[in-house]
């Protein structure tokens, strides 16, 4: 070993020992005839002092981030010089020898000062020398170990599934890989291990897990990565309660790493309730401000804007005092979200209603409105009217915006909730508008994925009442972030084919794309279900950072670019020729 001790491990009890340390020069201070450096390694920092004339001469050439090895005697710092801010603050190492292991060029940014994200990612190997980014990566390793410990205790088997496979429609675009030995044909990087983990259940593995790399060629959205990680699990002979129970045990083990005890059982809310009360299928329950249904209240209104299939409201406490320019700003805020605006009524301190909407209301509506929505004098009532889904989504976004503006969210709080019983299908146009890829060519597509089982009792309504079929599915939400989602799966070929048909996949197309799965279901497939946790998002929450990029060792930018390696990059003509990327496949011959 090039060193005898870790820099952060030395204490006053080590005084008198000769040690050899190795690490980086975090800071250098020249005090005339004495030079001090803060020597940093993965364990922490120790102050090294150079007094010996021969070693002092060498130390003059040290600069920030030189990699060095130092041998010397551990000494108690002189009285008054202790540093209580660091664990090694009572001691210093009096150097008797110095070896420069690697010099450093001038730094592109100072490691103890803020730097722009693109510069940080371009020099990520320097960024990770900082304490906060390094701590996030190290915590992630502990998170992996904690999850594995729980799963191993419950007899799960860790199995690796393929990372180059067949392109199958799963709700997003595939990254495609040309197959050089099969010109004109392509592999795909998996969007998830979904099909393989179901096949592992057919294979009798019974309990599978994997910390899986997944790939989705999505339009770039804020805080998304083209490659991401999920903790993937699947179990045979279970119902939703079994999957939820093991999931809660895993989450409790993870949050215990940061000293938080998750109250269990985690509360549940139906998808329908979440949308009606919070305007979101991933509600943040750290604050109240529930939406209020007003459709019945305004059923006889003469105000044309409120003559809509849905009218709802959310109250902003104290919002009546907002100046006109702020209220106008809310209209721009709503328009940026695709709405025409955000109607509002101001409740005066005397209880009188003001604002442009109030004068369009009947006397009875004005008299009863504040009581109906729970508004007090001085509050502002925001409204949305129109189709229920987009109107509730707008109010849900307004609810979150109000909470942020009023400081209603305790940043130290944790609020977990299961969202259960979502619809199995949604209109394909809605999925496309949200940036997803509809699996088939039908009017309906799957809300989660095409392999989710309908809730018991809904099987007969798949074709006849498609929009009202509920899924046997469950999402786990933390502080308004969906951190995991799962379901009981279809394990019968006939039901799977019916679901495909509703989504516009005819028998031939289903056979072409999913024939291997359908065939597997004919060999005694067990009932099974599972869940996948968004590992990057969970780690970001545990490290209390805003972006998942902070918990990924070498992330891409929001635009999918890696500033470090300058990927993606063009390929050469030779690579293009060898890959067969331009070869058109021969038409399939009829059997």
Curated annotation (Swiss-Prot):
Residues 194-197 are annotated as: Aspartate. L-aspartate binds at residues 170, 216, 448, 489. GO terms for cellular component: cytoplasm. The keyword Transport does not apply. It catalyses: tRNA(Asx) + L-aspartate + ATP = L-aspartyl-tRNA(Asx) + AMP + diphosphate. Residues 574-591 have a biased composition (Basic and acidic residues). ATP binds at residues 216-218, 225, 482, 534-537. It holds the Pfam family GAD. The keyword Membrane does not apply. It comes from the Bacteria. Belongs to the class-II aminoacyl-tRNA synthetase family. Type 1 subfamily. Homodimer. Aspartyl-tRNA synthetase with relaxed tRNA specificity since it is able to aspartylate not only its cognate tRNA(Asp) but also tRNA(Asn). Reaction proceeds in two steps: L-aspartate is first activated by ATP to form Asp-AMP and then transferred to the acceptor end of tRNA(Asp/Asn). This is Aspartate--tRNA(Asp/Asn) ligase. It comes from Mycolicibacterium paratuberculosis (strain ATCC BAA-968 / K-10) (Mycobacterium paratuberculosis). The lineage of its organism: Bacteria, Bacillati, Actinomycetota, Actinomycetes, Mycobacteriales.
């Amino acid at each position: 070993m090039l060193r005898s001790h870790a820099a952060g491990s030395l204490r006053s009890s080590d005084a008198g020992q000769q040690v050899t340390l190795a690490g980086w020069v975090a800071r250098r201070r020249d005090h005339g005839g004495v030079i001090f450096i803060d020597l940093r390694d993965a364990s922490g920092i120790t102050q090294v002092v150079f007094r010996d004339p021969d070693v002092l001469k060498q130390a003059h050439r040290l600069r920030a981030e030189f990699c060095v090895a130092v041998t010397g005697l551990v000494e108690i710092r002189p009285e008054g010089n202790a540093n209580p801010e660091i664990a090694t603050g009572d001691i210093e190492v009096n150097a008797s020898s110095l070896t420069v292991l690697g010099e450093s060029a001038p730094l592109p940014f100072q490691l103890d000062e803020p730097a722009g994200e693109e510069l940080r990612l371009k020099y990520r190997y320097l960024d990770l020398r900082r304490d906060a980014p390094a701590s996030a990566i190290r915590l992630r390793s502990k998170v992996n170990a904690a999850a594995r410990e729980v799963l191993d205790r419950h007899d799960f088997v860790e199995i690796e599934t393929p990372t180059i496979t067949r392109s199958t429609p799963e709700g997003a675009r595939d990254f495609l890989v040309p197959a050089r030995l099969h010109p004109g044909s392509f592999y795909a990087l998996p969007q998830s291990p979904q099909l393989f983990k179901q096949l592992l259940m057919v294979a009798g593995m019974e309990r599978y897990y994997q910390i899986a790399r997944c790939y989705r060629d999505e339009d770039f959205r804020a805080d998304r990565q083209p490659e991401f990680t999920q903790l993937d699990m699947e179990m045979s002979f279970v119902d939703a309660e079994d999957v939820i129970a093991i999931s809660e045990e895993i989450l409790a083990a993870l949050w215990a790493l940061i000293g938080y005890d998750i109250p269990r059982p985690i509360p549940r809310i139906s998808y329908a309730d979440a949308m009606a009360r919070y305007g979101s299928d991933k509600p943040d329950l750290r604050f109240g401000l529930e939406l209020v249904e007003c459709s019945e209240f305004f059923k006889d209104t003469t105000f044309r804007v409120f003559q809509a299939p849905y009218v709802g409201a959310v109250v902003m406490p104290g919002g009546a005092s907002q100046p006109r320019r702020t209220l106008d700003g809310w209209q721009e805020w709503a328009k940026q979200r695709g709405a025409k605006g955000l109607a509002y009524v101001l409740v005066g301190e005397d209880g009188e209603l003001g604002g442009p909407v109030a004068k369009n209301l009947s006397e009875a509506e004005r008299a009863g409105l504040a009581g109906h929505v729970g508004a007090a004098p001085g509050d502002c009532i925001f409204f949305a009217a129109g189709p229920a889904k987009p109107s509730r989504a707008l109010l849900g976004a307004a609810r979150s915006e109000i909470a942020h503006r009023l400081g209603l969210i305790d940043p130290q709080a944790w609020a977990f909730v299961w969202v259960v019983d979502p619809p199995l299908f949604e209109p394909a146009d809605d999925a496309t508008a949200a940036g997803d890829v509809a699996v088939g060519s039908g009017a309906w597509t799957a809300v989660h994925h095409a392999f989710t089982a309908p809730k018991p009792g809904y099987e007969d309504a798949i074709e006849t009442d498609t929009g009202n079929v509920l899924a046997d599915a469950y999402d786990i939400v933390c502080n308004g972030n969906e951190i995991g989602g799962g379901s009981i799966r279809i394990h019968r070929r006939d039901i799977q084919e019916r679901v495909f048909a509703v989504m516009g996949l005819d028998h031939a197309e289903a056979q072409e794309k999913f024939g291997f799965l359908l065939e597997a279901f004919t060999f005694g497939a067990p009932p099974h279900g599972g869940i996948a946790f968004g590992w990057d998002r969970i780690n970001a929450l545990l490290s209390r950072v805003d972006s998942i990029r902070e918990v990924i060792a070498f992330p891409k930018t929001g635009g999918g670019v890696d500033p470090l390696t300058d990927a993606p990059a063009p390929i050469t003509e030779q690579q293009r020729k060898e890959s067969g990327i331009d070869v058109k496949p021969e038409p399939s011959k009829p059997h």
